[in-house]
């Protein structure tokens, strides 16, 4: 009976080499200008075609009047020598000119421009990446398909709608990934919009074809059968649906016979009371991460909250900050996470972004087994590295970090600038190397990453928080601020509570830059204590 499963097999075209637009909102803005240029070129082409048609129309109207007069008295008309001459001239010369005008291709300029710009277009991987980002945002922020389709997202300035065809394409992307849960959600949304009367290039038969199979793959045979019957009402000759109908009915009959004795056990399971909600502390990391991204589950006792303060910080009497101390705020106690306010100016931010933009490349991670740098699905951003010697602003920023932390930046890594893409994120990770990764920073020769300094260089309309799932902390982006924490205890042991993540950007454009400071050079700046965990 396996031959009955004819149900859908779709392959996306192979992706070509591309710049990975979907991983950086900053670079995606270039596409807006590209499309604007193409629209201008297209309008020029339309104007040229309209001018051409106007000339042909005027010529046709003139000849229509002339031939109407001539056909009333052909002999009398050509008996006039001027008319005879003009008739010869028109047929010998002017009709040839008209033929050339009609055959003239006005699209050359537009096609030429389109061909030039096409090399900068996103490709299949970009489109699929953007689609997956929507699915990721849907899960992380508990958004239903109707909310996304209608563009009702928090903080949006430019509301945008999804057509039934768009919803269908999202469902197809999920299907290609064998993600039948999202396939069902988006095919149902497409079907809903079609049922509401939306005019579309897709039809209900195609949607039901995918939907019935997605439901079947999730084990809901009754619903799959119902949807298949609905499809056959619209297209009784649909070969795959007819095959599936027989297969579903066969499976249901077989299950009914085999599982009769087990039906009582199943009913007992259904009546079993549900377990009480699990405390946030004991949820799997993925759930805690998503809850924190939504601003849920963040709890700190009043006693702990009383230990959090705001203060002016002069960098241990650093001359640069005595008259204008830095504004410091405690974000969390264990691990201690500090935010510095108004610590980088808008002008400095723009210079850093301008330096980074031409160098932005897809962000990578170090493979713990091979040590090779590679792109991964859980880190969606582009990054660039800036050295202090190449621009005085970068050098000044580096020294500011040293003055405020008291740590030596000469052994730190270069300033990393990152711009997050559609649904841009970096799932939970450690900044420091664990004991099973002894060679992680061996080539640097500066030891482990003792601390992290993170600048927020843009406000984010929705999403994009930095969260610490182990402890329940969430730090929200605020332009011009920076956060700082130690990854290692003073003993050099890793602080596993610093495991953190960059939440997906729901709406907006997130720019950050960070400085990873290393152990070497800090021996007397942050000496170890007698305890491993201090």
Curated annotation (Swiss-Prot):
MF-aspect GO terms: identical protein binding; iron ion binding; L-ascorbic acid binding; procollagen-proline 4-dioxygenase activity
Recorded family membership: Belongs to the P4HA family.
Annotated catalysed reactions: L-prolyl-[collagen] + 2-oxoglutarate + O2 = trans-4-hydroxy-L-prolyl-[collagen] + succinate + CO2
Localization annotation: Endoplasmic reticulum lumen
Outcome of swapping residue 213 to A: Strongly reduced affinity for peptide substrate
TPR repeats: 205-238
Keyword tags: Dioxygenase, Endoplasmic reticulum, Glycoprotein, Iron, Metal-binding, Oxidoreductase, Signal, TPR repeat, Vitamin C
Broad class of where this protein is predominantly found: endoplasmic reticulum
Description of activity control: Inhibited by poly(L-proline).
UniProt key word Metal-binding: yes
Protein name per the record: Prolyl 4-hydroxylase subunit alpha-1
Glycan-linked positions: 113, 259
Tissue-specificity statement: Expressed in the heart, liver, skeletal muscle, kidney, placenta, lung and pancreas.
Requisite cofactors: Fe(2+); L-ascorbate
Superkingdom field: Eukaryota
Biological process according to GO: collagen fibril organization
Organism ancestry: Eukaryota, Metazoa, Chordata, Craniata, Vertebrata
The protein's assembly and partners: Heterotetramer of two alpha-1 chains and two beta chains (P4HB)(the beta chain is the multi-functional PDI), where P4HB plays the role of a structural subunit; this tetramer catalyzes the formation of 4-hydroxyproline in collagen.
Enzyme class: oxidoreductase
Result of altering residue 210 to A: Strongly reduced affinity for peptide substrate
Cellular component terms per the entry's GO annotation: endoplasmic reticulum; endoplasmic reticulum lumen; intracellular membrane-bounded organelle; membrane; mitochondrion; procollagen-proline 4-dioxygenase complex
Result, substituting residue 247 to A: Strongly reduced affinity for peptide substrate
Pfam families: 2OG-FeII_Oxy_3, P4Ha_N, TPR_P4H
Secretion signal span: 1-17
Comment on bound cofactor: Binds 1 Fe(2+) ion per subunit.
Amino acids binding 2-oxoglutarate: 510
The enzyme's E.C. designation: 1.14.11.2
